[in-house]
Design a protein with these regions (language model features):
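Positively charged n-region of N-terminal signal peptides that target proteins for export
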Residues: 1-4
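Generic anion/oxyanion-binding catalytic loop in active/binding sites
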Residues: 7
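HIT superfamily nucleotide-processing domains
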Residues: 19-179
């Protein structure tokens, strides 16, 4: 029962946090000092030529997770569809390369539903895939350039026989990754 109550509390609080507008504006560096979004502050630290960078997930409950983050950002909440197609493709490519480097072919990457974002900067969760997960409908694609836009819903991706299975419509997509 306690677990159920904690889960409900987390979902409600994440939803409320996500509905608060992000004050970060890269054109006004003073707004980044508020540190409302740690990922925006990290993006500002990266060199101008960086397209995608990685940070280890800071949650102690997710010690083996990484976040793939595009350096590019804009004022307010950032969504995947706001990234230019070339940056989005590089984000997917880089996340997949990092996942393969860490976990071989037993990896997964996830983009949670927009209403559940607790950080305003776009990011992809990179982790080891939980054994045996494969449910719901999915689209089979050949590579990162074919990954569809998630829209407001989340998605998660994993490899199967040299292709990518893209599961669309998952709200909390990162639950398929080991903590």
């Amino acid at each position: 029962m306690r677990t159920y109550v904690a889960l409900i509390f987390w979902i409600v609080s994440a939803t409320l946090r996500a509905q608060i507008a992000c004050p970060c504006n890269p054109q006004d560096p003073e707004t980044l000092k508020e540190r409302q979004c740690a990922l925006c502050a990290e993006a500002e630290k990266q060199s101008a030529g960086t397209v995608v960078f990685f940070v280890q997930d800071s949650s102690p409950r997710k010690p083996d997770r990484w976040l793939a983050i595009p350096r590019q950002h804009s004022p307010g909440m950032h969504h995947m569809d706001q990234l230019p197609a070339d940056v989005r493709a590089e984000l997917w490519r880089s996340a997949i390369a990092k996942a393969k480097e860490l976990w071989g072919e037993n990896w997964g990457i996830a983009y949670n539903a927009e209403k559940l974002h607790s950080q305003c900067h776009v990011h992809i969760h990179v982790g080891k895939l939980i054994d045996g997960v494969e449910w719901g409908e999915f689209k089979v694609v050949d590579g990162p350039e074919q990954i569809p836009l998630p829209g407001p819903d989340g998605l998660w991706i994993h490899p199967v026989n040299g292709k990518l299975h893209v599961h669309i419509g998952e709200q909390v997509a990162e639950t398929v990754l080991l903590r």
